[in-house]
Amino acid sequence: MEALYLLASLATTLLTSTLLSLLLLLRLPFARRSARGGGGAGATRLYEGRVRHSRRRPAGHAFEYAVRYALVDLDLLPLSGYLSAADARRIASTSGPVRLLTVPKSVGYEQNPLSVYYCYDEAAQEQDEHLKMCIAEVTNTPWGEKVMFTFQPGSDLVAKPLHVSPFMDMLGNWSIRADAPGNNLYVAIAVQHPTLGNYFTAALDAKLVGQTNDSVKLATFFWLMPHKVAAGIYWEIVEIS
């Protein structure tokens, strides 16, 4: 039954993504070419970079893949399926801007291992020292379970809250760091295990490549990005197995 469910899910995703990709293609000639599409207030920032996973014990293994992320000002552009700016401020006990780093859904499919809410003080503009708190939303693969927790952006230690891999147990802590996003973007999580030590690290390293308010440009920039992330994760599961 599980195999049939998986096949049905894959077939549905393939059909939906194909149809929505065709619709996106039809929209391209009619995309607005205005100043608003290039940036301005509330523009979504676009980042390109790489995610790297490195496992040192019990057996060494490493892989990396290219990724694209969006940084969204939630006060100006609320997103369905995510915390509102007001909810994020309440959770983080902050009073300023809230910006969400995430891989947006593409052509009907969502695969987003990590989203980060950057919560600033009220006086914050773009200065690193005013980033007060972060909220992480982690989704495991293949189960699709989610967990959310706050952490200090410079560096923080949290008890491991979620089973994220069939090759890791639930022991230990996560050491997590998130620099304030600017022209460069960096997020890292290291696993501190009571017997294996610091045996696993995952890091996102990216650069700002543009910004836009145009929905078609956003859709084309992130076209099939969640699918590529999922393919990379499942391929590595096969290799490790």
Language model features with spans:
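Mature, function-bearing regions of proteins
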Residues: M1-S241
